[in-house]
Structures are given as C-alpha cells and as structure tokens.
Amino acid sequence: MDYKETLLLPETNFPMRGNLPQNEPQRLKSWYEERKVYEKMKKNRQNAVKNFNIHDGPPYANGHLHIGHALNKILKDIITKTHYFYGENVRYVPGWDCHGLPIEQQVEVKLGDKKKELSKVEIRELCRQHAREFIDIQRDEFKTLGIIGDFENPYMTMKFEFEADIYKALCEIAKKGLLVERSKPVYWSWAARSALAEAEVEYEEKEDYSIYVAFELDGDALEKLGVKEASAVIWTTTPWTLPANQAISLKPDEIYVLTAENLIFAKPLLESVVQSGLSKGEIKKEFKSSLLENTHAINPLNGRKSKFLLGDHVMMDGGTGLVHTAPGHGEDDYYVCLKYGFSEILMPVDDGGCYDESIKHHGLFRSDVVDEFVGMHIFKANEKILELLGKSLLSVSKFRHSYPFCWRTHKPVIYRATKQWFIAMDESKLGGKTLRQTALKELEKVKFYPSVGIKRIGSMIENRPDWCISRQRDWGVPIAFFRDKATKEVIFDSEILDHIAGIFKEKGADAWWALSIDELLPKGSKYKAENLEKVMDILDVWFDSGSTWHAVLQSDNYDAGKYPASMYLEGSDQHRGWFQSSLLVSTAINSHAPYESILTHGFTVDAKGEKMSKSKGNVIAPQDVAKTHGVEILRLWVGMSDYSSDLKISEDILKQISEQYRKIRNTIRFLLANVNDLESLNTEFNILDKWILARAKKVFDEASACFKNYDFSKGFNILLNFLSADLSGVYLDVCKDRLYCDAKDAPRRRSAQSAMAIITKTLLPLIAPTLTYTVDEVMDYAPKIIKGEAKDAFDLVYEPIKFDLSFEDELLFASREKFNEIVDVLKKDKKIKSTLELSLETTNHNITSYDEREVADLYMVSSVRAYDDSEPLAEFELEGDKFKIIASNLHKCPRCWKFNASKEDALCPRCEEVISAK
C-alpha cells in the first residue's frame, strides 16, 4: 500500500519563488490604482491615539534617482510603516525642490545663444517644464520602491500657492527685524555668477601659491619704531587679493620683533620663519603690537597705504603673525576694518571673477600695467602679480590644501563683498533672544538618531555667520520687495507684502517679472509706482526647503500631519543643510524647532567603501536592482544595514541579501503550508511548542524594541537568527512527524499548528514595514486562522505574543547538539543512514519525565527511554548525566519511517491507530 496518500502533507499556493521583478509592478499598481492603500491606511487609523509624520526633505527635481535617493526614501517608508503597523495614525507627503541653479543651468545648456532672446518669464517657464518632467519621472521611480504616501498631492516648491507661502515666510522674518541688507564678503561662485550659502560649499583639494611679501613701513610707523628702515612681512595664499589690500592685522597684546634684515615678524613665529629661510633670527628690536596700531605700511604692488590694525582673528599657528587684510575678500578682514571705521571697502572683482574698471579708479595697479588687468580672471592674474612684486616677494612656493568649491559648478569659489540679504543670527529680536540663542535652545528639545547629531548641528549653529539668502539668478522665489528710488529704503509695508503674496498665489512668482510695479501695488496704495524700484534678487533654495514646514505642515493645502513634525530624516550632510535651514526659518518665525526628532543616515558606497562614480564603474542603480533582484531585496538591504555609518552595496552584497530573503520567504511558506487546515487555536501546548513560543516571544519583543528605536539592522539580525537557528533549524524540522503522520485533529498536531499560526500572525506585521510587497502577497494565500478579518497587509496591526509561556531545559538542547555531532560521524562511517534508526537512553530524569514522543521528535529518533544495559553505537556524558545511542530493536514503519513497528512491513501503533480511524 502507498501510505503517502494517508499523510497530511503541507499544502499552500504561496509560491516558493517570489519572481519579484515580474510581480512587484502588478502589486504596486493595485496599491495605487485599485486599493488606494494610502487612503486606506489613513481610514484604518482615524481613531488612533498616537500620530506620526515624517516631513519629507525634498529631493531636487532634476535627473533620475540614484541609490542614495532609494536608501533615503525606503528608510522613511520603513519608519512610517513601522509606526503604522504599531497602530498609529501616520502621514507622509512627498515633496520636490524645484527652484535653483542646476535646473537653470540645464535649461541654459539647451538654449545656448537663444537665451539672450528670451525674457526672464520665458526662461522661468522652461525651468518649470524641466522640473515638472523630472518630478513625473521620479514620482514613478519612488513609487516603484514600494513607497506609500500622498503621491496624488505631493508638495512642489514651484506650485503657485507654495511660492506664495515661501514669500510669506520671508515677510514674517522681515517683519521681525531679522532680515538685513548689507555689503559683506560672502562665498561667491564666479562660475555660477551668484552668492552661495555655507551649505552650498564643498571642500576639495586645490593647488595654490604660498607667498611672503614685504610691505615697507611708512613714515609714521618708522617714527613709532624709531628706525629708518623696516618692512612688515605678510603671508598669503591669494596673490590676486593683494591689489585690494587695505590693512595689515596684528595680534593684540602680542610681542613682535624687528630682525637684523629689517623685517618684522611675531616673536612666537620667529623660529618657523628662520626655518623657512626668511631670516637668520637675529633680533634688533622687540615691541608690542599696539605700538604700530593706526600707523601705515606701503603696498609694494600699487604704492597705496595699508593701515596696521589689531584683530583677534590673528593666530600664532602659522605665517608671520602679520595678516594681509583685504576687507572686500574676507569675512575676518571685513569685520576688523568695520571696527576701525573704514568708510570704503575695495572689491575690484566682477560677477565672473575678473578685475573690473575700479582697479583704475582706485589705483590698485601701477598706471603703466593697469589696463592689462582689466577683464583678466583673478586666478590668471596670480603669476603676473608675482612678477610685479619684484624684490618685495621674499618667498614663493606652491602647496595643496582643502579649499571651498561651488557644489554645483565644482569650481573654486572666492570671497567677494557684495550687497546681499541676510537673516541676522545675533540680533535680539525674539523676545530679547537672538536667533542663534533660540535655535540652540530649541535643539536641546530634539531627539537625535544617532545621538551625536546634536553636537554636530549645535556646533554649526554656534559658529555659523549670518545666513546669506539672496542669489543673483532667475529661477527661484523673488525677494519681492520695493525700494524707494530716492532714499534706497526698502518698503516693508504689510498691505503691500500681503497683496504681493496674494498675486503669487494666483499667478505664481513669475508675476514679479511679468507685471509692472503699478500692477503689483494694491489699489489706493500711498506709494507711487514711479518712486519705486524692484529688488531683483531671488531666494537661496535652502530658504525654499527650509520653509517647507510653513507651506506644508501649517497649510490647508496638504494633509501632512502635525507641526512640529515627528521626524526629519535625511543624510548626515543635512546637518549643515536642510536641518539647519528649517530650524532657522522655524525659530525665526515661531521660536520653535520644526521637528521633534532628527534621524540621519550615511552615504552609499561600494563593497570597498569607495564613493560610487561612473568612471569607476561601481554604480549600483536602483532601477537595475529592481529589474534583476526585485525592490524587496533593496528594501531588505536597507533594513539589514547599519544606516548610522556609510552603507556598502554591490552585486555580491545584493546576492547575500537575496539569500536571506529566500530563507524568510521559504520559512513563511512552510508555516502557511502547515496551518492550512487549522480553524482555531489551541491554548494547551506541548513542551516543544512552549519552548518555541517562549523563544519567539523573547525574540519578537527584542526585535520590536529595536524597530521602535529605529535600530532595524539589529532587529533583523535577531529575527533572522531566530528564523534560521531556532525555528527552521530545530522546531519546524522536529515537528514534521506529528504534522504529517498524526491524526488531523490530534492534540499534538493541533498544538504545533497553533504555535506556528501564532508565530506567523506575529511575524507578518513585524516585517511588513520592510517587506511590504511580500507580506501583502502572503495575505493573498494566508488561511483565515492567520489573517482573521484582514483583507491585505494594510489591515494588520502588530500585537506581541500574549501567552506567558516558559520552557527552559539547557541540558535537553545541549544534549541534542552533542547527539547531532556524534550522529554526523556515524553517518560518515556509514553505520546508520537516518537518526530514525536510533533510540536514545539517558540517566537524566527530567528528560525521561517528558512526553516520550516529544523528546523523541526533538532528537529525531524513534524513542527515548531510561538508561539500561543496551549495547551502544556511541555514548557521551553531559553535566554528570549519561547518554547512550543505540540501534533500535524494532522495525521501520512504512508510513512514518520510525523504527517503532513490532515486525517487518507492519505499521507502528500510532500509524495503525490513524489508519484505522479513517
């Protein structure tokens, strides 16, 4: 007789292979088009006690997604869904940053010379079209990653009402007195012809000159020193700024020396000066820096006087202790000259980084050579300036150092004093506090993941300068203020500001360029159009993104959740970017941080830890991963990676993740297949079921705690170890006999099935935030005992295992491990083919007191009994108890294959009973 037909073999239609690249797109379509799962999620939790929202840091609407985008959006999705599957009401509104230089440059490249023929409004419309095109592309790419959010109504900084909200935020800051316009050296990208904020500057290696230049002392300085000849020696790495030199800064209260060569240096630096060969170190005279204050030296390049000043910015860690001071090209230089009341700041460089006509008017070069320098790029002028210095150039060399570059053009930037708009950090306008003080105080209330984040952003806020928010470009929200032509005073009239905001909401910010001043003024305004002019600068895009909380979280245009947001989540570079700009705008307006918590992740790198680049051929594109492995593999990679540092990804790493996914999927499939006929849960459990449920409860509780703390890699490590070692490695294996061979309703079988059902029901919502595609697929095949009334994955809620079970017998499992080691040797020596041929005897009374069938299943032998004098195949001892492995003296049952039958080809008593009952 073929007994196979009498066995209760596992049965499920849940496929062994996921075929993820083929199946995921269909499921995604059903989520968004048929089931409307985001709306369903909102409805399911409408009465929830807790609320959670991540405010999306907007990606730039330019280009396709890269793996860093995928990491960021998947992590946001996992965290949002984690809160959802814990029963919380969640909101996630994706957004896009639409204005700014990269899009404008793309449009300029397409236009070429045609740009000159177009108006600013026409150029802006082309920029808008470009952004719209890539928003549509990126929206589909984000959704493909399994991201669930309000993609039907995302926020875009170029929407008319959004531009109006950005402008309103600017006006609120202006009304608080925190917006100031002044000339000041700022980072200037000559390649982009615009000012830059700190966040738009990156540091790269650059080769520069290192020069020492002698400035002869003028008569007043020589008189103070009581000498007839002396020169102040300055050190600089920017020869091109020497024409604009206006002063030489000395350290207050420091001792300076005049050497035998009639050169002046700071005394603490004399030793290093000697080593550099500038002097032999013989001192003729010592004096305090204050002696030269307000006296003069002569600039050897142009003969102009250079005043000696005292400045705290002068350091004794290099150079000569005499600092070349050009206030038009350096922030420290600017402030020290401001302190000394300089009425004129020289800045002879135009927007494109070339010397302008002012070098003639101010005599910044000798008259016989000045024409040669007009229109010359400053970096090309360095060599010619060195030639002109002649004998005054004491030393010249080249060196490499870290230098600021424009993040968009990747060209070196300069400091350039221009008239710009700033948000003041140190004006006491917020209830007697400054913006810097308020922002730092608010940071103390924010929870950081990882916790070191507060130190990073805190030190940046402490040390940052005023925020330069103006740009000299076309594609952005205008700083839409009027200026009185006669007085040059800026008009901050509430009626006008509100009226312009209303126009922007209706027509967009293009109206600032499209409409005349008369058309932009409210009817009946006391101001006359002919007396006004427009401010034509636009806002820094960091102000756009920094005010998104204002336009999204405090607006009726979006259902985006609360303000402040539960979380902001971006890469660690955003401490100096979006986290900071958002904090400053929010505290300037509301004296409140816009977020309750900040989570940062590292960057994606290849398997060697190197940055990805096309030239290296190590780029992993999310679109390629989706096509070859499936999005679920990418999501599991995010879940299993420690995002607090840089995340490695490569084809080999993805294959390893795929293998882990296969184990998870096959484990779930086995569980589904073996509970297919279970209709109700048992509450009485056998010892092995108690053991696995106790282990599952402990593991799920630990993993859940990790997930709640956003430590996903640790949580998955705990889970996968349990699924592999305890569940698949032990329990599911030892349960097969009772699942397949016991009677359908046998208590032992129903006990095992109940344990499996409980584990599956608990596991699914625990992994659903990460493996959403898979869990949703599981729900299509899960029996009612697992899914209950849930129609799909989005109806699940995580509930911990409630059974307070415990089963501990370390010796039982330790003896099993030792038994398996010995059995492996017996199999290799071909003494046995299967452990079912064996019986086990032991002196341990605990083990023999358990249900004999349970213990036999654990060892996967035919029987376990008390120790006697049987002849052993092998034996071992543990903790004083003896164990003897013997060959069974009974026969193999043709149905269950256990050696418990009384004679050849006969059924064992258990199988006989099951067959008879049928």
Swiss-Prot record:
Q: Which UniProt keywords apply?
A: Aminoacyl-tRNA synthetase, ATP-binding, Cytoplasm, Ligase, Metal-binding, Nucleotide-binding, Protein biosynthesis, Zinc
Q: Where is this motif: 'HIGH' region?
A: 59-69
Would you say which domain of life the source belongs to? Bacteria
PROSITE patterns referenced in this protein's UniProt entry, alphabetically? AA_TRNA_LIGASE_I
Record-listed ATP binding positions: K614
Q: What class of enzyme is it?
A: ligase
Which GO molecular function entries does the Swiss-Prot or TrEMBL record give? aminoacyl-tRNA deacylase activity; ATP binding; isoleucine-tRNA ligase activity; tRNA binding; zinc ion binding
Cofactor mode of binding and number, as noted: Binds 1 zinc ion per subunit.
User: What residues does Zn(2+) bind to?
Assistant: C893, C896, C908, C911
| EC number(s) reported in the record | 6.1.1.5
Annotated Gene Ontology cellular components are:
cytosol
**What pairs make up the disulfide bonds?**
none
Query: One Pfam family for this entry, by name?
Result: Anticodon_1
| Binding of L-isoleucyl-5'-AMP, residues | E570
Q: Where is this motif: 'KMSKS' region?
A: 611-615
Task: Tell me which NCBIfam families the record gives.
Answer: ileS
What the record says about family reads: Belongs to the class-I aminoacyl-tRNA synthetase family. IleS type 1 subfamily.
Protein name (record):
Isoleucine--tRNA ligase
